[in-house]
Amino acid sequence: MFGATQVSKAQFLDKARQAREERKGLKERDRAAIKIQALIRRFLCRCRLQKEIRQEVDDFLEGTEKGSVKANALSIFRISRKLLIIFQISQDRMRFEKLCRCILNSMENDNEPKVWFVSLALSKDLTLLWIKQIKDILWYCSEYLKQLKPDILQDSKLITVYLTMLVTFTDTLTWKILKGKGESLRPAMNHICANIMGYLNQKGFYSVLQILLTNGLARSRPSLSKGTLTALFSLALRPVVAAQYSDNLLRSFLIHIMSVPALVSHLSTLTPDRLSVIESNGLFHKFILFLSREDQCSDVCECLEGSHTLCLLGNLIHLGHLTEKVLEEEMFHFVSVLTQMLSYCQKYVSQKKSNLTHWHPVLGWFSQTVDYGLNESMPLLTKQLQHLWGVHMIRNLFREVLSKKLAENQDVSVPVSQSSSSSPQNNLPMKNLFKRAFQKSASVRHILKPIGGKKVDSPEVQKVCNICVLYQMALTTLTQIRLQILTGLTYLDDLLPKLWAFICELGPQGGLKLFLECLSSDTEESRRLLAMLVLFCDCSRHLITILDDIEVYEEQISFKLEELVTISSFLNSFVFKMIWDGLLENAKGETLELFHSVHGWLMVLYERDCRRRFAPEDHWLRKDLKPTLLFQELDKERKRAQLLLQYIPHVIPHKNRVLLFRNIVTKEKEKLGLVETNTASPHVTHITIRRSRMLEDGYDQLRQLSQNAMKGVIRVKFVNDLGVDEAGIDQDGVFKEFLEEIIKRVFDPALNLFKTTSSGDRLYPSPTSYIHENYLQLFEFVGKMLGKAVYEGIVVDVPFASFFLSQLLGHHHSIFYSSVDELPSLDSEFYKNLTSIKRYDGDISDLGLTLSYDEDVMGQLVCHELVPGGKSIPVTNENKISYIHLMAHFRMHTQIKNQTVAFISGFRSIIRPEWIRMFSAPELQRLISGDNAEIDLDDLKKHTVYYGGFHGSHRVIIWLWDILANDFSSEEKAMFLKFVTSCSRPPLLGFAYLKPPFSIRCVEVSDDQDTGDTLGSVLRGFFTIRKKEPGGRLPTSSTCFNLLKLPNYSKKGILREKLRYAISMNTGFELS
């Protein structure tokens, strides 16, 4: 019973709670309904009111347009007030435009003050309300300006309306109410205008102007009219002038206005009067002083980021170019500001592409976000930047250097080498680079050598150092126009020699000692001095690279040859000291940049001297470097010795480098187990070669060998024409004969794998060698054979064209390499024709040339296009330098590219490229073909081995050496050496290194009857006993063994006659 009561009570309470909640929910729903109804009524009321107001505004504006309503200032004010209450930018666009036109029309009314909208500013009751209203109207004008595109016709009309509003009500100049008696009110009205401008600035007015200017000017052709640009610039300038050039407004003007791409360029083109306003207000002067104070420049740069900082830099440079007087007065601050801005940009310049970098057309890979909307304006920005290295600016900045007079010496005569070659030219926009009157500067002055005497802390030196820092910063920051900068800096023919003269005078003892001291000093002064050296090296290297031999050796543009000797000596010592003193081992940043700059200039001079000598004998050697010490350090793997060999091997005597090369090869042979030892013998590869098919059999059997097997011992067995094995054991001699024969055949121009240059004495891959089946595999095989000869120290008489040797060394990958430079080594006549085009003063298009090359290929005329569509592109004065380079590159690279790549691949499979980088092109030729010096008979006699009874005191041997020394010419001695060894040149390291050694053997019978030395033959030879008079026989040779077979002649005259005949006929083994 009690349990049922408890259940009913719980149910009752539950029902009561539910009832309360229902009542509460009903009340809330009623309240919500009432609130929603109120909101809807309010919304509908507001919509109705807005509609009524808009209708009223529309009726008013339509009436004013038709003339049915005469609008005065008060009616416009009231209607504007109503519109501004309900104003929405997107909905009231057309309405607002009509209102602005109405206001502007009122301002143009004649002699009716009550109509002028500005008259309300004079009403005590309405002044504050009017100011508030005009501020709002002008800001809405600004908001619309942000959205408009100047290149759209309709938008450009609206821009004119809104700009006119802003121009009209931010300056009292056009207010008719202030004319006459109202002039006394102008100060008060000016104050109101300043107040309006202040309000707009606080709201971000400069950002609006920046957007509109950028939209209209950041393109190849500006879309802003003269009037629009004038209005925009006037509006931008007003707050600055009104605030009496306060730091805050100067900063805003620089960040938002002067950072607009090529603004000054467009002003000078469209509205030159605005530039006069800049000048009259001294703006450039104020900009430079502001940016030079404390951290203002870095603050502005941080706000702008890289792309826009570059735009500001371009505009400042352009202003500096236009205002020469201010530039002279504020040169120190101008240079300092530009350096700081370039330094800021440089922090974000990257050397390579990565996930964090973006491509910039002037800065290259850039680690900040790049505004690609500015790309169209980059050509104009580049033109602005070019003023920095233009003649006008360089003359101003380097005035102290250029004012220096170089002492003249009329009696100096300069020996000029007779060989001819060319140097690279640079296809850059400076069209008249090669037509300058250079000749006057270099040919008559004293040689400039380090003399010292100028204090490095003097104002003059500090100024020049700062300028050099600026240009060096430009070179490392503006990476994509670096060549333009270098061309500009080298345009004045006397800048570089005078800068060198300036460097020579620095410090108490002259340049070298001072700069070496700077290397060990980490001070700001040292860095600036080294920047001067870097700039000099970069510019000089660029100049010498683009000059040809006539300009360097005969006209001696900028530098005399003796000065190049002095400079190269300075550079050689400087680089050597940097390496040997350990400064390069952990170098980075500025030190590494310094080294690459000085080393690059040094190597350009060295390579030019290798092609055509201007320096004295042994000029490049370091007398204080002992080769034995260097070799010891190389054995210990000391870093400085390795770097020396990598960067300046030329300081080591050539013979020592050849010894080093041979040591490297020997060590590799030992490492690969290719050398006979007491415990092991090297693996031997045996091949059988038919004499009638020597090339084919050699190719088939050797091309499949592994790299190590090719480097190892190869034994050759010859099979004669009858298919019978030839007698004899190959102890390197037969392989030498095989190798020499292979090389002789493949390099024979008749085979058409290689052909001779125009001079007929040098070889390079034949462009038509593709007629051979598997010709690329053949070239790779030939490369291996030549590599094997060099590897084994076998000299072969194969004279290569200089340009081909440069490619074998990898020089063509250098940024300083030019095909034109090497062209004479291929075809001197062709080179003369091309350089005559370069020097042609008339209109080159009259010659009817195109960017193509016509060639007779096996009876058919083939047209090779140098660029895509080249046969339809005429050669003009603008592209003729490019044409010369393209033509040279085609002849020496493109045309034989595949053959060269295959040959080099084969050669490098035997000879590593780093082994031969220590040699120049002529030195590599000597490594391949032996020394081109006179044959040293004493050395040959000392290292000759005698057989068959001959000995050093034998009568025939004495006659032989006497004939060679006194009766034979140099040419005949070379023929004699070729007769015995197959090569007319002696080994590089002397005859001690000839393998097999030079040998002379006494023979009694013909070669086909010769069975070698016997006891009887040796005794007869030793005691000069003859079976019969051998006067009818000729001397013969076995070149595979470097063996001269000499009959035991009875008279010296017979020996002379027979030997001369034999070597002239080059009979050798064949005449036996």
UniProtKB/Swiss-Prot annotation:
Gene Ontology, cellular component aspect: postsynaptic density
Associated pathway: Protein modification; protein ubiquitination
Superkingdom of the organism of origin: Eukaryota
GO molecular function: ubiquitin protein ligase activity
Matching PROSITE patterns: HECT (PS50237), IQ (PS50096)
Domain HECT: 706-1072
Catalytic residues as annotated in Swiss-Prot or TrEMBL: C1040
Major subcellular site: other
Top-rank EC class of the record's enzyme: transferase
Entry-linked Gene3D superfamilies: Hect, E3 ligase catalytic domain, Hect, E3 ligase catalytic domains
EC number: 2.3.2.26
Keyword Transferase: yes
InterPro entries, A to Z: E3A/B/C-like, HECT_dom, Hect_E3_ubiquitin_ligase, IQ_motif_EF-hand-BS
Listed CDD domains: HECTc
Catalyzed reactions per annotation: S-ubiquitinyl-[E2 ubiquitin-conjugating enzyme]-L-cysteine + [acceptor protein]-L-lysine = [E2 ubiquitin-conjugating enzyme]-L-cysteine + N(6)-ubiquitinyl-[acceptor protein]-L-lysine
Keyword Nucleotide-binding: no
IQ domain residues: 29-58
GO biological process entries: protein polyubiquitination
Localization annotation: Postsynaptic density
Entry keywords, A to Z: Synapse, Transferase, Ubl conjugation pathway
SMART domains: HECTc, IQ
Transmembrane segments: none
Stretch forming the signal peptide: none
Role noted for this protein: E3 ubiquitin-protein ligase which accepts ubiquitin from an E2 ubiquitin-conjugating enzyme in the form of a thioester and then directly transfers the ubiquitin to targeted substrates.
Protein's name in the database: Ubiquitin-protein ligase E3B
